[in-house]
Amino acid sequence: MTSRLFALIPCAGTGSRSGAAMPKQYRTVAGRDMLHYSLAAFDACSEFAQTLVVIAPDDAHFDGRRFGGLRFAVRRSGGASRQASVLNGLHALAEFGARDDDWVLVHDAARPGITPALIRTLIGALKDDPVGGIMALPVADTLKRIDATSSDGRIARTEARDGLWQAQTPQMFRIGMLREAILRAQADGHDLTDEASAIEWLGHAPKLVQGSLRNFKVTYPEDFDLAEAILSRPAAAS
């Protein structure tokens, strides 16, 4: 049987660094909730069997009516960390018939610049890969490591950027492998910040697929203006 595709959007974070009065995934950007753009991108890819959004059990901001017409399901099973929310989401996908050998694409709700074209680029590059992989960009800036003993932000040294890539999402792995990887990381006392880290912890080497600058993560207050500018352009609908 052909492996199917599922999308998982962990959406239980508070977005404390964004300075917003509500979780940043619900803040309005270019006329819509930030979460809408990710849902719309996956909805435009008819090859997905289901898109699942995992929100916090006590989330009072989510309103499904704001995403009318888009295909997705919601589960209030968010955990205390991203890793916990993703694991709970993987368990929930079984309700929709997901099998261990099916693919899951995990995507940050705070990356509204994702497009159907980027999603399909990732799928095309990884559908026959034995491990899976992630969207990423080569590091372009010079990297400085701060002196941990300095109280005023002094540079300790410059880090070589050769071979360094900045991880993005979606991150695409087999459901069974990713679940096993997260459970192993948890058992070893690690709370990892992305899915690729868990797969690496299991001893595998995920593949990097070049992404796009537009698919950046909205993190700080000034990022909202950049997201607004990108998403207001006609290309954002492609």
Curated annotation (Swiss-Prot):
UniProt xrefs under InterPro entries: IspD, IspD/TarI, IspD/TarI_cytidylyltransf_bact, ISPD_synthase_CS, Nucleotide-diphossugar_trans
Domain of life: Bacteria
Single Gene Ontology MF annotation: 2-C-methyl-D-erythritol 4-phosphate cytidylyltransferase activity
Reactions mediated catalytically: 2-C-methyl-D-erythritol 4-phosphate + CTP + H(+) = 4-CDP-2-C-methyl-D-erythritol + diphosphate
Record carries keyword RNA-binding: no
UniProt keyword annotations, A-Z: Isoprene biosynthesis, Nucleotidyltransferase, Transferase
GO terms (BP aspect): isopentenyl diphosphate biosynthetic process, methylerythritol 4-phosphate pathway
The EC number(s) this enzyme carries: 2.7.7.60
Biochemical pathway: Isoprenoid biosynthesis; isopentenyl diphosphate biosynthesis via DXP pathway; isopentenyl diphosphate from 1-deoxy-D-xylulose 5-phosphate: step 2/6
Family matches, as PROSITE patterns: ISPD
Gene3D superfamilies in the cross-refs: Spore Coat Polysaccharide Biosynthesis Protein SpsA, Chain A
One Pfam family matching this protein: IspD
Residues flagged as site, Transition state stabilizer: 17, 24
Residues flagged as site, Positions MEP for the nucleophilic attack: 161, 217
Alphabetical list of SUPFAM superfamilies matching this protein: Nucleotide-diphospho-sugar transferases
Enzyme class: transferase
Family that this chain belongs to: Belongs to the IspD/TarI cytidylyltransferase family. IspD subfamily.
Protein's job: Catalyzes the formation of 4-diphosphocytidyl-2-C-methyl-D-erythritol from CTP and 2-C-methyl-D-erythritol 4-phosphate (MEP).
Protein name (record): 2-C-methyl-D-erythritol 4-phosphate cytidylyltransferase
Species this protein is from: Paraburkholderia phytofirmans (strain DSM 17436 / LMG 22146 / PsJN)
Lineage: Bacteria, Pseudomonadati, Pseudomonadota, Betaproteobacteria, Burkholderiales
Gene: ispD
